[in-house]
Amino acid sequence: MQIFLKKLTVLSLILFLSACGFQLRGDIQANFDSISITGGSPSFNKTLQRKFRQAGIPIENAAQAEKIVEIIKNNFTKTILSLTGTGAVSEYQLDYEVTYRFKNQNTPWNDLITIEANRTYTYDDADILAKDEEEKRLVSGMEDQLIKTMATQLSLSK
């Protein structure tokens, strides 16, 4: 009887979530067939292009692309957030900001759009390798968040 109730609960939860339109986030969902990306730092630009390619959206030159994106600025900063009593860093804040504009083929540029992602993490000199790896993962997650936000805004534009 308990197994039946557990299965019934799980099934009803799945039905409820699917009925309300809930979807797990997956790859980039876009309503355009090709994109051109210029500007920005080489590492961010490369990551952005890779994410669009993984979603099946080809990267074209500006003359052939349906959407044209120009990254005006992408800036990553690392700020000390707090110190221990001895003056050692105990917490950092990571900020990643991207300013860009886009247009469809044969239309004027839209206004500049700035998006940002912030993360904080604790720091300990005793775990320097682990904390460096944590920082890399946080930065990668911030880039993914910014890229998904950009893709959503591009898809919602006419």
Model-derived features with residue positions:
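Bacterial N-terminal signal peptides that target proteins for export
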Residues: 1-9
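C-terminal motif of bacterial Sec signal peptides marking the signal peptidase cleavage site
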Residues: 16-19
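Bacterial signal peptide processing site
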Residues: 21-24
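Acidic/histidine-rich, surface-exposed loop or edge segments in extracytoplasmic proteins
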Residues: 29-35, 126-131
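N-terminal segment of the mature soluble domain
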Residues: 31-75
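Sec/Tat-exported extracytoplasmic proteins
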Residues: 52, 56, 102, 106, ...
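Surface-exposed short loop/turn segments
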Residues: 70-114, 121-133, 148
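C-terminal/domain-edge helix-coil "capping" segments
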Residues: 129-158
